[in-house]
Amino acid sequence: MSSVSPAARRRARLLASSVVLSLAFAAPALAQSSTLPTVNVTASRAFNGITGASTSVITADDIAHAPAQSIQEIIAQTPGVQVTSLYGGVHGAGSMIDLRGFGAFATANTLVLINGRRLNDLDLAGVDLSSIPRESIERIEITKGNSGAVLYGDNAVGGVVNIVTKTGAGGPPVKMRVEAGGGSFNQQQGSVSAALNSGPWSSSFYGTALKSDGYRDNNAVSQRSAIGDIRYTAPDFSAFVTLSGDDQRLGLPGGRTVDPSIGLNQLLTDRRGTSTPLDFADRQGVNVTAGFTRTLWDGAELIVDGGVRNKDQQSGFFGSLPVQSFNESYMDSSLQTWSLTPRLSIRNALFGLPSDVLTGIDYYDAAYRSNRSQLQTTTPVHVYDLSQRTLAAYWQQTLGILPDTDFSYGGRIQRTSLDARDRFDITAPGAFDVQANPLRQDETQHALHVGLEHRFNEVFTVFGRAASAFRTPNVDERVASGPSFDASFNAVPGTFALKTQTSRDIEAGFRIKAGAFAAQSSLYGMDLDNEIHYNPVLFYNTNLDPTRRYGSETSASLRISEPVLLRGGVAVTRAVFREGAFAGNDIPLVSRLTANAGVTWNLWQNFVVLDATVRYWSSRRMDNDQAATQPLIPANATVDLKLSGAWDRFFWSLSVNNLFDAMYYDYAIASTATLGRFNAYPLSGRTYMVKAGATF
C-alpha cells in the first residue's frame, strides 16, 4: 500500500532523482577569476567577498581535517547552511545543501560555482558535490543572501557557494599523491593526483573512484570522476584548457512507511529495507572549458572563457514487488549547455578614490530533451524538448569612500528566451494524459546590490547591504506545472507556465578579529514573491503566496594555544508563508535552530591530530506538510571524530562518524490524506572510514 498519494509519490521520486542526478562539475577557470571578487582599496589592505555581505571561507586545511566524509556535511558546519540527505552512508550521494531555508527546493535557490563559473543547470538536479575530487579543492567560499545575483545571475537567492580548485601553476616540477581507503558498508575508494610545472607551462590531474553497498538495500553506489587541465602563465597573459568528467550509478531504496492507524512502522521493523528494489539513477557528465586572461593596462584585465558541458541521466522507477504496470516509469534525459563569459576587471583610482570594477557579459545556451516512457524498451509517452538562452550584462563597483569605509553597488539585467514543446504518443504503453501546449516566452529580469563596510579599528568591522535576486523556473518544474486533470478527472494539457520567482533582502552585522579570536554575526530578512513550490493538494508545481525568510547567523573561533583550535556557530532560520491559506506556517524541511562546535588538537607534532565536531539541528516540517498538521521530523545531533597524522611523505586517518549511533532521518514526505502517515528516508548510525596514502 502506498503511504502517500500517487502524485505525491511521484514528487518524492522527482526529489530523489533530482538530488542524485546532478551536474558533473565544470572546469576550473583562470586563477585570476577563481575567487569571488577581490577588492583592493589600498596597497596594504585587501579583503575578499562582496562588500557588505556575509562571507565564510573553508580552506583546504579545514577540509583535510574535517571528520565529515562528504563536502555537503563540511559546508553544513557553516552557520546558516542546512543539509538534507536521502541515503546517508559516507559518500555524500543524494545530499543537498540549503542556504537560508528553502527546503525541498534548496538546490534551485543555491547557486554553486567552480572557479567563478556557474554549475546550476536548466533542470531541477542540484550540483552533486560528491562528484568533485575532494583533494582538488583549494577552498570553498560561501556568500549568503541575494548579493551574488548581480555577478552570477539567477539561482543566487539563498546564496552562492564558490569552489576554488587547485592548479599546478607555481608548484614544484613534479608532485604526486595517492590515497586508498575502506569503511562501513563495504565502501572502497581511491584517489590519485599529479601536477607538473615547467616554466610558464603547468598541468594537473585529479581522479577518484568509489564503491559502496550503501546503508540500505538497493542503495549501492559506484562513482568515478576526474579533472585535468593544461595552463600557460606569463606576466601579462595566461590561458588554460580543462577537461572533466564523471559517472555515477546509484540505487534508490525509496522511503520507509509509518502509519499508526494500521500499526505500521518500517523505521522500527525494517529500517534498512527497501520497497523499491529495482529503482535506480545513473548520470554521466563531460565538460570542456577554455579561456585566457590578458592585461590591457596596469590594473585592467580582460578575462574571457567559455565552455560546453554535457549531462546524460537515466532513471527507472518500478515500485514494490510484484511490479505493477501503473507504477513503472523510465526517464532518459540529456542536457547540453554552451557558455561564453567575457568580463573586464579594472582596479584603478576613480576621482582619487580606490576603485574596483568587475563588468561583463554572460551568454548561456542550453538544450534539454527528456524521453518519458513506461519502460526503457517501450515507446516514450512524452518527449519534452526545451531550449533556453540567456544573455546578461552586469556591473559591480567597490569604492573606498573613506580610509576605513568601503561602498559597493551593482546591477544586472538578464534576458531569457524559452522554447518548450511536448510530443505525446497516445499509443505508447502507459499513456493516460494529453500533450502539453507549447510555450515560447521572452522575459527580462534584473538584480541589484548595494553594500557598505566600515572598520572602526583593526579589531571591529560593521557591514550591511540590500539586494534583489530572481530565479527562473527550471524544466522539471515547468513539466509538472498546472493541473493534469479537471474536476471530472478528464486529462487537460499542461502549459509549462510558471512565473519567475523574485526576492529582496537586507542584512547587517559585524566582524571581530582580535589576535587568536575571530567572530562574525549578522541579522537578515528576505521577502519573496512567486516562490516556486509543489502544491500537495493540487499535485503540481505552482507559484506560492508571498513568503519570508529571516534569522541570525553567528560563528566564532579561538586558538587557545598553538596546537588547539576551537570553533563553533549557531543560526536561527525562519522560513514562513506571509500570506495566503498557510500564512504564518513554516516552509517544510527547514529547521529553526542549527548549531555546531568543533576542536582541532595537534596532539603530537602532526604525527597525531585529533578533530572532533558536533552538529545539532532542531525539528522541521515534513515535505508536503504546508498545512502543519503532520508530525515533525525530530531534532537530533551527531558527533564525529577523526584521528589523522603524517610522517615524512606518508599520511593516514581514522574517522568515526555519528559516534553515538543516533537513529535519525533528514527527509520525510507526509500524506495529505491520512494523519500521521508518512514516508521517511532513514540515515545510517555509526560508521567508520580508514584511509592511508603517500605523496611523491
Language-model segments: which ranges?
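Face-selective signature of the C-terminal outer-membrane beta-barrel domain
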Residues: 238-244, 282-430, 437-438, 453-455, ...
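Short acidic/polar hinge/loop motifs at secondary-structure boundaries
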Residues: 117-146, 163
